[in-house]
Each structure stands twice: as structure tokens, then as C-alpha cells.
Amino acid sequence: MAAGSTGERPFFEIVTSIRYWVIHAVTLPSIFLAGYLFVSTGLAYDTFGTPRPDAYFQASESKAPVVSQRYEAKSQLDLRLQ
């Protein structure tokens, strides 16, 4: 081992090895596929509790509600959601 070496394999040696690509040829596409399915099925909305894009506004509304009284905001929004 050379002086100052940490004993780790050089990055170039890892990336050019067959073993690296055999492992990563399966794992990398799997990660992207899992992420795509997590978002496209709507499970991400359910997991993090965020509203779905069609649930931000009620059908009768065309824009975001405006709160007119700062300290009455909760009651104004509660009235809107009923």
C-alpha cells in the first residue's frame, strides 16, 4: 500500500468492473421504477398527506380563496370547506 493511501479501490477501477455493472444494471432501474410507481399511483399523496391536484379547489371555485381577516382565517376556511 502506498503512503497516504486509505486502502480503498480507485473509483475508475470500480466503475470499469463487471461486478459493479451486474449489480447496478438491476438496482438503478429498479429505484427509478419504484419512484415512478410511487408517484404515478398516488401513493405519495396518501403517504405524505398532501392533497391531490384536483382537490385544491372545490368544483365551484375558479381561484384560490382569499382570507380577508387575519385572525379569523381558520373560521373563514372552515366555512369554505363545509
Swiss-Prot record:
Annotated Pfam families: Cytochrom_B559 (PF00283), Cytochrom_B559a (PF00284)
Keyword Secreted tagged: no
Keyword Protein transport: no
Signal peptide location: none
InterPro entries the UniProt entry points to: PSII_cyt_b559_asu, PSII_cyt_b559_asu_sf, PSII_cyt_b559_N, PSII_cytb559_asu_lum
Entry membrane topology: Single-pass membrane protein
UniProt cross-references to NCBIfam families, sorted A to Z: cyt_b559_alpha
Family matches, as HAMAP family: PSII_PsbE
Assembly and binders: Heterodimer of an alpha subunit and a beta subunit. PSII is composed of 1 copy each of membrane proteins PsbA, PsbB, PsbC, PsbD, PsbE, PsbF, PsbH, PsbI, PsbJ, PsbK, PsbL, PsbM, PsbT, PsbX, PsbY, Psb30/Ycf12, peripheral proteins PsbO, CyanoQ (PsbQ), PsbU, PsbV and a large number of cofactors. It forms dimeric complexes.
Family from the record: Belongs to the PsbE/PsbF family.
Protein name per Swiss-Prot or TrEMBL: Cytochrome b559 subunit alpha
